[in-house]
Amino acid sequence: MHCPFCNTVDTKVIDSRLVSEGSQIKRRRQCAICHERFTTLEHAELVMPRVIKNDDLLEPFNEQKLRSGMRKALEKRPVSTDALETAIHQIKSQLRATGEPEVPSKMLGQFVMEALKKLDKIAYIRFASVYRSFEDVREFGEEIAKLQDNPSLHQKD
């Protein structure tokens, strides 16, 4: 590791700790030349599959785009940022678990719909209306009826 102060390569770790529920390692380092101390954070870099769009174009997975779309559906809904981040982490895990280098955008959309259905039914309907391009009120009603007909989805808020 290069020292950010004098750019030498000779640094040593003087302390290490797990952070972020064990998903990162925080290391305290000291330069052997200038003796300055600095902190580094290490995390595993996981390769995400690319997304096959409806027009067959390939696009790199974009976590910010996923987060933005889910936030828009969850706008003004009583869902914590932690719950959203957990859902995003689960969706990314599902994508990696496919083992495929490329996944269709429809699969990603289904994972998002499943996650939103668990988080907040209103957000689920909002997302579904855009994702499935609802044309009229009838389609909203049909989707709401599906939610009401599935007793495993009923939760007390």
From Swiss-Prot:
Record text on cofactor binding: Binds 1 zinc ion.
Reported cofactor(s): Zn(2+)
Zinc finger (unnamed): 3-34
GO molecular function: ATP binding; DNA binding; zinc ion binding
InterPro entries listed in its UniProt record: ATP-cone_dom, NrdR-like_N, RNR_NrdR-like
A Gene Ontology biological process term: negative regulation of DNA-templated transcription
Domain of life of the native organism: Bacteria
One Pfam family recorded for the sequence: Zn_ribbon_NrdR
NCBIfam families per record: transcriptional regulator NrdR
UniProt record similarity statement: Belongs to the NrdR family.
Annotated protein name in UniProt: Transcriptional repressor NrdR
Organism: Hamiltonella defensa subsp. Acyrthosiphon pisum (strain 5AT)
Gene: nrdR
